[in-house]
């Protein structure tokens, strides 16, 4: 773990750890800063092992709508419903998740490669358990108000709420910082009108629990080849076909295995809850296209941010970022109504201009900050001068009073 890390999460982990110097982290992750450690013997639950505590990252941009107030509360409620999810324990007022020892599925089997049958079957078993969990079966506090939720089985309304989040929170809220970059990439408010037309007409399907982020890095293979699902931060109730679409989009199975996953998913969800795959042939492509469109805005912002974190952006880094943006824009162009995707060179020019403008804004804010600090120093100096003057006046008054007393005494 980097020695310079001194976050609240790191300090808390060190205080709870049996051996503070053996705290591991922060682990990679977008939403949280995570630390892993062993608890002292007296604090352990069950068979021991390592545990993890997590601290939400500050100033985080959320690219996905969240449903539940607490992931830990959700995991507590899911015990007995979903197999192979992390256990929880509360220590000194902090809820910890058991750390699953093993490797991510992605570390063992990269994107675009087939998932072995043993793990593939366990993924399907997880979908079987998810579709069996209905909205009324879990008593977990939600973030959104009832009026902001789609009605039961209203798949079109469910997707529209997701589009609204992308439009308002990802696109709209970031216009001050990224508006000119979006415009240079031919992305504007009309993009969402085109997207809504493109995905219109979804069939109704009964809602169930969705993991909503089921990809190779959120699936852990332990030493006995059991598959564990982690990171339930984005879980929600909604259209079961959306969970399949998200999974297929993120997993990047080879074509044959993707087709088999779709066919097996359809059979198992219909077995558990009839109607869960209704209209899948027409609707799955629409949901996949929404994921492509959503990724355009997400990846443009993330890629731009990654450039800002580099101490120096050279031509090679800028060109690599441009290819990333061009690729995601090419895949999302049709649902967003982008008729002609800008070339890689045009994307590179747009990113370079955005970086220059951002550097200018940063320097301007720094100058404003220096001026503010200067005004504070001047104000403090004036205050010190007034205080010294008052002190001198009080000293003179005391001296005069003492002199008057001496005269009276004489």
In which residue ranges do the predicted regions lie?
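Conserved HxN/HPN-centered segment at the entrance to the catalytic loop
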Residues: 79-92
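Conserved kinase catalytic-core helix
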Residues: 78, 106-148, 181, 185-202
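ATP-binding glycine-rich loop module of kinase domains
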Residues: 31-68, 107-112
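Conserved short submotifs of the Hanks-type protein kinase catalytic core
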Residues: 94-104
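Juxta-kinase regulatory segment immediately upstream of eukaryotic protein kinase catalytic domains
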Residues: 1-25
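ATP/Mg2+ or Mg2+-diphosphate-binding catalytic cores
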Residues: 298-375, 404-410
